């Protein structure tokens, strides 16, 4: 064996890898989002590294916002588990999220709303 160091410890400590998500202080996977952005662009174009970090930060913020509002909706109904109904109430209750998310949520039900003209005044009686 001429000069090989295979299988021998050279004495240097191997540096632990730090993910781009932890560098950016995010929970969402920056590397995976970067890979998906590269694969989805036309003719596998170039995507900057900061684009993936920015996209991951946006997705994480929106997810946290929706989950917080849905958690509040489930807490108001005295339930411990978030259901699609709670997501629907949270998204449709917030004006900005409602404008952003136009999708139909399966199992979300309908938003309770009674038109003002259908509500009678307190002093009025129905005549038959």
Swiss-Prot record:
Modified residues (N6-lactoyllysine): 12, 14, 116
Region Disordered, residue ranges: 1-20
Domain of life: Eukaryota
Any GO BP: heterochromatin formation
Pfam families in the cross-refs: Histone (PF00125), Histone_H2A_C (PF16211)
Keyword set, alphabetical order: Acetylation, Chromosome, Developmental protein, DNA-binding, Isopeptide bond, Nucleosome core, Nucleus, Ubl conjugation
Position(s), cross-link Glycyl lysine isopeptide (Lys-Gly) (interchain with G-Cter in ubiquitin): 122
Main location group: nucleus
Location(s), subcellular: Nucleus; Chromosome
UniProt keyword annotation of Nucleus present: yes
InterPro entries (alphabetical): Histone-fold, Histone_H2A, Histone_H2A/H2B/H3, Histone_H2A_C, Histone_H2A_CS
PTM (free text): Monoubiquitination of Lys-122 gives a specific tag for epigenetic transcriptional repression.
Annotated positions of the N6-acetyllysine modification: 5, 8, 12
Expression by tissue: Ubiquitously expressed.
GO cellular component, one term: nucleus
Alphabetized GO MF terms: DNA binding; protein heterodimerization activity; structural constituent of chromatin
SUPFAM superfamilies tied to this protein: Histone-fold (SSF47113)
PROSITE patterns: HISTONE_H2A (PS00046)
Bias (Basic and acidic residues) ranges: 1-12
Acyltransferase listed as a keyword: no
Its job: Variant histone H2A which replaces conventional H2A in a subset of nucleosomes. Nucleosomes wrap and compact DNA into chromatin, limiting DNA accessibility to the cellular machineries which require DNA as a template. Histones thereby play a central role in transcription regulation, DNA repair, DNA replication and chromosomal stability. DNA accessibility is regulated via a complex set of post-translational modifications of histones, also called histone code, and nucleosome remodeling. May be required at gastrulation for correct mesoderm formation.
Subunit architecture: The nucleosome is a histone octamer containing two molecules each of H2A, H2B, H3 and H4 assembled in one H3-H4 heterotetramer and two H2A-H2B heterodimers. The octamer wraps approximately 147 bp of DNA. H2A or its variant H2A.Zl forms a heterodimer with H2B.
Family to which this protein belongs: Belongs to the histone H2A family.
Protein name per its UniProtKB record: Histone H2A.Z-like
């Amino acid at each position: 064996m001429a000069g090989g160091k295979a299988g021998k410890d050279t004495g240097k400590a191997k540096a632990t890898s730090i993910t781009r998500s932890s560098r950016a202080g995010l929970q969402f996977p920056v590397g995976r989002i970067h890979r998906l952005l590269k694969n989805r662009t036309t003719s596998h174009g170039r995507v900057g590294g900061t684009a993936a970090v920015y996209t991951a930060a946006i997705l994480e913020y929106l997810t946290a916002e929706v989950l917080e509002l849905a958690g509040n909706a489930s807490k108001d109904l005295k339930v411990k588990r978030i259901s699609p109904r709670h997501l629907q109430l949270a998204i449709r209750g917030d004006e900005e999220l409602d404008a952003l998310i136009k999708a139909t949520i399966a199992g979300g039900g309908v938003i309770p709303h009674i038109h003002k003209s259908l509500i009678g005044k307190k002093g009025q009686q129905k005549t038959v």
